């Protein structure tokens, strides 16, 4: 078996909340992504699906290193890129792209999977 093109191990992306949580005197921490792992094989299509606010875009931005990971490892073609500096990342960023969801084609959590699949057939 060959090395994955992209491998993510126990990725964490936490953000400090600017204002304290209600009834708390300490600033909070928002766990946008917490211990996510997956791999993408070369030549394969990978879709990351989830509800709004579940961390999909944050994962993409962490892989491209637009958000600095709080923890975990990110590998591209076997090279660990999670801790690289900006200049070291440039050649990798030229090879990667994140395609963000179209809000008009996203899944609505208030509908069942059957409703979502059948809707286009009912319209046409």
Residue ranges and their predicted role:
Residues 1-124:
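ABC transporter nucleotide-binding domains
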């Amino acid at each position: 078996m060959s090395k994955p093109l992209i491998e993510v191990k126990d990725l964490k992306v936490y953000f400090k909340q600017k204002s304290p949580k209600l009834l708390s005197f300490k600033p909070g921490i928002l766990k946008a992504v917490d211990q996510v792992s997956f791999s993408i094989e070369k030549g394969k299509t990978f879709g990351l699906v989830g509800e709004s606010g579940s961390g999909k875009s944050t994962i993409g931005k962490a892989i491209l290193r637009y958000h600095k990971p709080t923890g975990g490892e990110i590998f591209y073609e076997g090279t660990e890129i999670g801790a690289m500096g900006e200049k070291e990342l440039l050649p990798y960023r030229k090879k990667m792209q994140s395609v963000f969801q179209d809000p008009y084609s996203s899944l609505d959590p208030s509908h069942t999977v059957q409703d979502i699949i059948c809707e286009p057939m009912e319209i046409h």
